[in-house]
C-alpha cells in the first residue's frame, strides 16, 4: 500500500507510465483492496484481516471458468476512486462492452467479463451518473446472468439480473447488513435468528448508506 498526499489518479498514471510492471489494484482514500490466490483463511492470515477496521467489507472467492487464475483476474474489481465490485455469474457480451468503451478512453487490464461490467459503471460514473442510475443503465447494456455487489465509501449496493438465476440472500438487523450467496454463510452471525431475511428481487436495486 502506497500512502501519499498527492492526487491518487496522478500517482496511478505515473506508476502506469514509469513502472508498468507494478499492478495498481485500487486508488482512493477510503477503500483498501486485497487480491491473491489461495485458500481464504490463508489469505486472511497473510494480510492480517483480523486487525482491519472499517464500516463495510466486500469479499469474494472465485472459481474461474473462462479466465486465468491470477490476482489480476480476481475480484473485487475497481472503477475509479473508492469503488469495488464483485460478481457471481457470467456475462455473454463483455467483448461488445469493451469494443464500445475503449474508444471512449476506458482502459481494460484483463479479459475478465466482470471487468467489462466494472468498466461500464466506471464510464457512467465518469459521465455524471450516480451509482443507481449507472446500474439501471446496465440492465440494457450488460447481457447475461449476474448478481453484482458494489461498495463505495458511502454506499453498499446489490442487484440481480432479470432472471435472478444466481442466488443471493440479505440479512438486516439494527446493527448490521450482511449479504451472501447462501444463508449458510450468514448462519454464524450474531442475532441472525432475529434478522430480517430476504432474497433480492430481479432487477431491483437495494442499497444502504454508510
Predicted regions and their residues:
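N-terminal segments that mediate ammonia production and transfer
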Residues: 1-210
Amino acid at each position: 500500500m502506497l500512502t501519499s498526499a498527492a492526487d491518487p489518479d496522478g500517482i496511478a498514471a505515473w506508476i502506469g507510465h514509469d513502472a508498468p510492471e507494478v499492478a495498481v489494484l485500487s486508488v482512493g482514500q477510503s477503500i483498501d483492496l486485497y487480491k491473491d490466490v489461495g485458500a481464504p483463511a490463508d489469505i486472511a492470515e497473510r494480510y492480517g484481516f483480523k486487525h482491519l477496521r472499517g464500516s463495510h467489507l466486500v469479499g469474494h472467492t472465485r472459481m474461474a471458468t473462462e479466465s486465468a487464475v491470477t490476482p489480476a483476474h480476481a475480484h473485487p474489481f475497481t472503477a475509479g476512486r473508492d469503488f469495488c465490485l464483485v460478481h457471481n455469474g457470467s456475462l455473454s457480451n463483455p467483448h461488445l462492452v469493451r469494443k464500445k468503451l475503449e474508444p471512449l478512453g476506458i482502459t481494460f487490464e484483463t479479459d475478465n467479463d466482470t471487468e467489462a461490467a466494472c468498466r461500464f459503471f466506471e464510464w457512467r460514473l465518469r459521465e455524471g451518473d450516480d451509482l443507481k442510475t449507472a446500474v439501471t443503465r446496465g440492465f440494457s447494456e450488460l447481457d447475461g446472468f449476474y448478481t453484482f455487489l458494489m461498495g463505495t465509501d458511502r454506499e453498499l449496493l446489490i442487484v440481480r439480473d432479470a432472471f435472478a438465476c444466481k442466488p443471493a440472500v440479505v440479512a438486516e438487523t439494527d446493527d448490521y447488513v450482511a449479504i451472501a450467496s447462501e444463508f449458510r454463510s450468514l448462519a454464524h452471525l450474531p442475532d441472525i435468528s432475529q434478522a430480517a431475511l430476504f432474497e433480492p428481487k430481479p432487477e431491483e436495486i437495494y442499497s444502504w448508506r454508510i
